[in-house]
Regions:
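Divalent metal-dependent catalytic cores for phosphoryl transfer on phosphate-bearing substrates
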Residues: 49-170
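Acidic/His-rich, divalent-metal-binding segments that scaffold phosphate/diphosphate chemistry
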Residues: 1-84
Length: 171
């Protein structure tokens, strides 16, 4: 994925254009072995394989860890790599990529939300129902979704992203 390109014809001349060069830094990028037995790209590919064949979910899984390993994100914690806040950086990168690839704004908004939220879901499951309900109410009033049905579909997709992501770890 990271080294794939397509040919584009411009003024009667063909040129090679990289499709997703933003993935390049994920190749061989180590993760904390307490949670991951794969490098970031391998984890991403396993997560995609775990997910359903839904375009928004697949894109969210391709892009969910893009922020990992970047200079302003990667830290060493107790001698192990950690990427606090990578989901926000990944979401910003996802928005740029999907916009560049000319996906519709509504689709971009959904995938960006899935990427941005993929780390929030797990801790809330552990802290209890009240915390989860408070978060859902907060998201419902954020203006992110114009209809209740959109919100319900987004949450269902987020569950799928979470399950696919967790299935690609050994946490």
């Amino acid at each position: 994925l990271s080294d794939m390109s397509c040919r584009v014809k411009y003024k009667e001349e063909y040129t090679s254009v990289p499709i997703l060069p933003e993935l390049r830094h994920l190749v061989g990028l180590p993760q904390n072995p307490k949670f991951h037995c794969y490098d970031v790209l391998e984890h991403t590919l396993f997560a995609i394989d775990n997910g359903p064949r839904d375009l928004a979910i697949r894109w969210a899984l391709v892009l969910h860890d893009l922020g990992k390993g970047l200079e302003n994100v990667r830290i060493m914690k107790n001698g192990q790599p950690s990427d606090p806040g990578h989901e926000a950086v990944s979401a910003a990168m996802a928005e740029k990529i999907l916009t560049r690839l000319q996906y519709p704004p509504k689709f971009v908004k959904l995938v960006v939300w899935l990427v941005a939220q993929h780390m929030r879901f797990a801790p809330m499951l552990l802290t209890g129902e009240k915390t989860l309900l408070r978060w859902i109410r907060s998201e419902a009033t954020s203006g992110q979704f114009s209809k209740q049905q959109e919100m319900a579909e987004a949450y269902a997709k987020l569950v799928e992203v979470f399950l696919a992501d967790m299935g690609a770890t050994h946490a």
